[in-house]
Amino acid sequence: MISLKSPREIDIMARGGAILAATLERLAAEVRPGITTKALDVVAEEFIRSHQGAKPAFKGLYGFPGSACISINEEIVHGIPSPKRVLKEGDLVKLDFGVEFERYFTDSAITVPVGHIDAESQRLMDVTKAALAAGVDAARVGNHTGDIGAAIASVVSAAGFTTADDLVGHYVGSKPHGDPQVPNYGIPKRGPKLLAGLTIAIEPMVNIGKSATRTLKDKWTIVTQDGSRSAHFEHTVAVTEAGPRVLTATPVPVAP
């Protein structure tokens, strides 16, 4: 059964989403050559816990050891923070984070360049952002999950890129993951219908190369099978009668 949220519940999620947006903004500012992914994870957890009522949603979830999923270059998602993973000039780092606030969850991700990146990596980032925007715009009452997926896939395929196999968006709200799934491909008017009050994570994961993926021996990190780079952007979105409401776009003010 699909869970729908009241306007009051959506407002609570938006407050958590604002904390999440601020966390990603803070993390992006810390990204630089020489920093480890573990150091970024520590910054994220400390920043989240500095906001009353907020805590990292991913830490310990299904046994995940970090607070943030931090994935580099060909790593698509679920990279485990490590003191041995050091960012280098030209890397693409994906920062994927969830917040639990007053018992409600939000989920968001960004891709950040480490210093100067090559033109194709920049194009990958731009296309993935555009695909997310197209998916969000399709998250309207009366549409279906297939409309979101079709909108994302149209942007990605036009650029000559692919969406990662078997990795999809999902319901988020009273729990961090659930149904309906929100694939990054689809046929308009197919899949579960979007109703007012539905809250979902829309998250295109886009590869320069082929769509095939594999999981590393750590049983968490998912990478492109051909070693090509991947980008990831994600928002938590509420479907409302007034149109899609992005809950993770506007950060709370950050103290100097």
Positions of predicted regions on the chain:
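Active-site neighborhoods and metal-handling regions in enzymes and metal-associated proteins
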Residues: 1-256
